[in-house]
UniProtKB/Swiss-Prot annotation:
Biological processes, Gene Ontology terms: DNA-templated transcription; positive stranded viral RNA replication
Catalytic activity, as annotated: RNA(n) + a ribonucleoside 5'-triphosphate = RNA(n+1) + diphosphate
Broad class of enzyme this protein falls into: transferase
GO function terms (MF aspect): nucleotide binding; RNA binding; RNA-directed RNA polymerase activity
Homology family: Belongs to the ssRNA positive-strand viruses RNA-directed RNA polymerase family.
CDD domains registered for this protein in UniProt: Bromoviridae_RdRp
PROSITE patterns xref list: RDRP_SSRNA_POS (PS50507)
Phylogenetic classification of the source organism: Viruses, Riboviria, Orthornavirae, Kitrinoviricota, Alsuviricetes
Keyword annotations: Nucleotide-binding, Nucleotidyltransferase, RNA-directed RNA polymerase, Transferase, Viral RNA replication
InterPro entries documented for this protein: Bromoviridae_RdRp, DNA/RNA_pol_sf, RNA-dep_RNA_pol_alsuvir, RNA-dir_pol_PSvirus
EC number: 2.7.7.48
Composition bias type Basic and acidic residues, residue spans: 800-812
Protein name: RNA-directed RNA polymerase 2a
Subunit comment: Interacts with replication protein 1a.
Length: 857
């Protein structure tokens, strides 16, 4: 029976069986070592006391130095104890000994190599064995660089007895394992020779080709991470590297693992580095070059133009009610962005705006499909769905769970909105065919260069009230969780508690991608899609009466926007805000994809709503025309295809793990959003900052390899410079560092007004003369009929003294009219200053502090 070659470990090396530990096996070997060390500690029996120090240090100077090693004396002061003695030491003592003997390199709070008790004690035992090997064996041991290479190549530690050591000069590089390099190394004084210019052969500091002062200034902000790509240390620093760092008693040999090939051409340093400090002007220049039509986009009055201009639209069966429109509630203002990224203002749901959105999102349903037998074909599509995606054994063994708990969670979530158990309606008494309608006030960022000719239309939401949704949502949530548990391993739905876009052990590089873009997805769905959903829901275990009930009030419905006074009937198409929207869109996309492509040819398949992405080793084969001719969808196969789904790029790190990165083009547009409400304590701005930080938590995983992937995918998808994407990452890194940096992106006119007034330490005092108007006295406080504010009474110069808090939002004309109605001032009137862009307005355009008194604003 053939046994596999033993892997390299210190234990196997001591007992004579040794092998190679590849980077992919490091984690497995280390776990085995930890288990062996734990077992050794449990079964440890102290050995008889032996004076090890005399046996080691007696002839320490007579030990032979391996060939090719430096001639410095080898110190053995740290190996006077055996491995058994180190087992009795505490972790703190071992940590101090590790730092003294190995001298690890510190990277922040990390050590390279990292401290491991088992590996450290085993290394000491091996070092002691290597020191005694020349005395215990008559054979000639190889030089240490050859010795380390022999460990990796599974060759002998000693030279052949028939040949002398001098006769065998083995080229170590010819026996290297790919990715490893072994070369003699000796400690130096730390002096580094000055760089030499390739152009004129002079020292770079004296070379006229380089401006040393500018170079010094550009490199002032450099850190360790700017020049060295810090990868995960686990798996890179192995036992052989740890042994080579035990310098006091081993011949120094540089043994390192190189993940990336060393560049053959040395590139002279550039004066403009990517690590230069990021400022607001750099970010704006990136926006101007990447989004040329966005930088000058200003839609402040676009909706005013729409409301005041002539309007013509062609819709059938529309009901308009103009008598009970809900007036717009004025807000407290919004923060103003410093960047101009093409972000629009909030949309108000007026009648014209709603009609425009309905025309684009709900009306003009395309008729692209052929005539088919709906009953027979819907069953066939549903059957193909289960064969392609569902694990039958898991579906048979799983059941509904957490339906009631999901209901209570939903009620608790919306408790603050006034939803209670007593207000739940009787669904049999409700007309479920009536849906409320609204438009989204936030418009999705536009990545195409069309803002100069096309005004984005807001998306619409068609929804039931919370009392109705609360009774359907728990059922579909539990059904979706069961659906996820029954999916095959290669199918990923990036939503919920048990799935995400993080894929461990899967590399997106060297794969063929397939991305299908489905346009007009919601309104293109018809009776065929509804029948497919009904068969799939019944197959997943949803009660048949509920499935039929749900599908019945989706066949013909009526939507109404109470605020805009617009209503119209619709049929079949997706309701964008009910309890089944995401789940229904996902299974429709999966069913259509399984009918057009053989899913067995893909290694991974990702679905989320109307988005889909597939990875295959060979170019995918299928018939995408069926999306149009059979399923009535406007489908487009994205070419060139890149790993992109849910507005995120998928990248792979050096360890073969895949993670998601939000689209930099969309994120840089969000930095200029105009939808952050103003607040005195910046609570809304801080909430946007925390959301921004959560979306960009991937930045800590971005190595140079990942940045190169992102630049390539960005360039392929948008036909724009990939270097701009790398610069955007630098901006994201700055503005996620702290909230103070993020606040540089926004300002407020109100905040500027308060900032100016904060330098004034005066208070405006207004004295009113006695008036003939009737007053009321209550609790000793005079109150004018026309003035609802209560003001304390007092005497000042024979008159009544009041302190009036004046809002800066009042206009000067309004204030003067009120003053005339209230009466003439007995004392000198101090004009209330008005803050303009050019300075102060009022008497002599002087700040209020020059008039004296007290002003409160």
């Amino acid at each position: 029976m053939a046994f596999s070659a033993p892997t390299f470990s210190l234990a196997n090396l001591l007992n004579g069986s040794y092998g190679v530990d590849t980077p992919e096996e490091v984690e497995r070997v280390r776990s085995e070592q930890r288990e062996e060390a734990a077992a050794a500690c449990r079964n440890y029996r102290p050995l008889p006391a032996v004076d090890v120090s005399e046996s080691v240090t007696e002839d320490a100077h007579s030990l032979r130095t391996p060939d090719g090693a430096p001639s410095e004396e080898v110190s053995v002061e740290f190996v006077t104890y055996g491995a058994e003695d180190y087992l009795e030491k505490s972790d703190d003592e071992l940590s101090v000994a590790f730092e003294t003997m190995v001298k690890p390199m510190r990277i922040g709070q990390l050590w390279c190599p990292a401290f491991n008790k088992c590996s450290f004690i085993s290394s000491i035992a091996m070092a002691r064995a290597l020191l005694l090997a020349p005395r215990t064996s008559h054979r000639t041991m190889k030089g240490f660089e050859d010795l380390v290479a022999a460990i990796y190549t599974k060759s002998d530690f000693y030279y052949d007895e028939e040949c002398e050591a001098d006769d065998i000069q083995i080229d170590v590089s010819s026996r290297d394992v790919p990715g490893y390099s072994f070369e003699p190394w000796s400690r130096t004084s730390g002096f580094e020779p000055p760089p030499i210019c390739e152009a004129c052969d002079m020292i770079m500091y004296q070379c006229p080709c380089f401006d040393f002062n500018a170079l010094k200034k550009s490199c002032a902000e450099r850190t360790f991470a700017d020049d060295y790509v810090i990868e995960g240390l686990d798996g890179v620093v192995d036992n052989a590297t740890l042994l080579s760092n035990l310098g006091p008693f081993l011949v120094p040999v540089k043994c390192q693992y190189e993940k990336c090939p060393t560049p053959t051409v040395a590139i002279p340093p550039s004066l403009n580095r990517a690590t230069d400090r990021v400022d607001i002007n750099l970010v704006q220049s990136i926006c101007d070059s990447t989004l040329p039509t966005h930088s000058n986009y200003d839609d402040s009055f676009h909706q005013v133009f729409v409301e005041s201009a002539d309007y013509s639209i062609d819709l059938d069966h529309v009901r308009l009610r103009q008598s009970d429109l809900i007036a717009k509630i004025p807000d407290s203002g919004h923060m103003i962005p410093v960047l101009s990224t093409g972000s629009g203002h909030k949309r108000v749901g007026t009648t014209k705006e709603v009609l425009t959105a309905i025309k684009k999102r709900n009306a003009d349903v395309p008729e692209l499909g052929d005539s088919v037998n709906l009953s027979r074909l819907s069953k066939a599509v549903a059957e193909r769905f289960f064969i392609s995606y569902i694990n039958g054994n898991s579906l048979a063994s799983s059941n509904f769970v957490n339906v009631v708990s999901n209901f209570h969670d939903y009620m608790e979530k919306w408790k603050s909105s006034g939803l209670s158990y007593d207000d739940l309606p009787d669904l049999h008494a409700e007309n479920l065919q009536f849906y409320d309608h609204m438009i989204k006030s936030d418009v999705k960022p536009v990545v195409s260069d069309t803002l100069n000719i096309d005004r984005p239309v807001p998306a619409t939401i068609t929804y039931h009230k919370k009392g109705i949704t609360s009774q359907f949502s728990p059922l579909f949530t539990a059904l979706f969780e069961r659906f996820q548990r029954c999916l095959r391993e290669r199918i990923i739905l990036p939503v919920g508690k048990i799935s995400s876009l993080e894929m461990a052990g899967f590399d997106v590089k060297n794969k063929h991608c397939l991305e299908i873009d489905l346009s007009k997805f919601d309104k293109s769905q018809g009776e065929f899609h509804l029948m497919i959903q009904e068969h799939i829901l019944n197959g997943l275990g949803c009660p048949a009466p509920i499935t039929k009930w749900w599908c019945d009030f989706h066949r013909f419905s009526y939507i109404r926007d109470r605020r805009a006074g617009v209503g119209m009937p619709i049929s079949f198409q997706r309701r964008t805000g009910d309890a089944f929207t995401y789940f229904g869109n996902t299974i429709v996309t999966m069913a259509e994809f399984a009918w057009c492509y053989d899913t067995d040819q893909f290694e991974k398949l990702l679905f989320s709503g109307d988005d889909s992405l597939g990875f295959s080793v060979l170019p995918p084969v299928g018939d995408p025309s069926k999306f149009t001719t059979l399923f009535n969808m406007e489908a487009k196969v994205m070419e060139p295809a890149v790993p992109y789904i849910c507005s995120k790029f998928l990248l792979s790190d050096e360890f073969g793990n895949t993670f998601s990165v939000p689209d930099p083009l969309r994120e840089v547009q969000r930095l200029g959003t105009k939808k952050i409400p103003y607040s005195d304590n910046d609570e809304f701005l801080f909430a946007h900052f925390m959301s921004f930080v959560d979306r960009l938590k991937f930045l800590d995983r971005m190595t140079q390899s990942c940045i190169d992937q992102l630049s390539l995918f960005f360039e392929l998808k948008y036909r724009k410079s990939g270097a701009e994407a790398a610069l955007m990452l630098g901006a994201f890194k700055k503005y996620t560092a702290n909230f103070q940096s993020y606040k540089e992106l926004y300002y407020s006119d109100r905040r500027q007004c308060e900032l100016i007034n904060s330098f004034s330490c005066v208070e405006l005092r207004i004295e009113r003369s006695s008036s003939t108007k009737q007053r009321k006295k209550k609790d000793g406080i005079e109150r004018r009929r026309s003035d609802k504010r209560r003001t304390p009474t007092g005497s000042y110069g024979g008159g009544e003294k009041t302190e009036t808090k004046v809002s800066h939002e009042e206009s000067t004309g309004t204030r003067s009219q009120k003053s005339q109605r209230e009466g003439a001032f007995k004392s000198q009137i101090v004009p209330l200053p008005t803050i303009l862009s050019g300075g102060w307005s009022g008497t002599d355009r002087a700040p209020p502090c020059e008039h004296g008194g007290i002003i409160r604003i």
